[in-house]
From Swiss-Prot:
It comes from the Eukaryota. Auxiliary protein of electrogenic Na(+)-coupled sugar symporter SLC5A2/SGLT2 and SLC5A1/SGLT1. Essential for the transporter activity of SLC5A2/SGLT2 but not SLC5A1/SGLT1. It is a single-pass membrane protein. It comes from Bos taurus (Bovine). This is PDZK1-interacting protein 1.
Length: 114
């Protein structure tokens, strides 16, 4: 069997190459540019598709908005029914539902909590 393989291999090596195996040369410059632009656009489309499916925002939790009467107030998740005592320290004396924006001096910069 090895002798037959050796004879077939030597015959294949002795034959001239087929015409389809010889190179035709370089492509024209405009064709190279067209191929480069097409490949670039395909890669950008793939990147947009991956970004769209990979980076989708997760749906918000159900208890994110609490409705009081006809007004919706945003609440933090996990703080449902809890009162923050920090809010009482900067309530406005003019209106019960308003807060004071107390300025704090830090050198030459005037900053406020909001």
């Amino acid at each position: 069997m090895s002798v037959l393989s050796l004879v077939v291999l030597s015959l294949l090596m002795a034959l001239p190459p087929a015409s389809c195996q010889q190179g035709r040369g370089n492509l024209q410059p405009w064709m190279q540019g067209l191929i480069a632009v097409a490949v670039f656009l395909v890669l950008v489309a793939i990147a947009f598709a991956v970004n769209h499916f990979w980076c989708q925002e997760k749906p918000a939790p159900i208890n994110m908005v609490m409705t009081i009467g006809n007004k919706a107030d945003g609440i933090l998740v996990g703080t449902d029914g809890k009162y923050s005592s920090m809010a009482a320290s900067f309530r406005s004396s003019e209106h019960e539902n308003a807060y004071e924006n107390i300025p704090e001096e830090e050198g030459k910069v005037c900053s406020t909590p909001m």
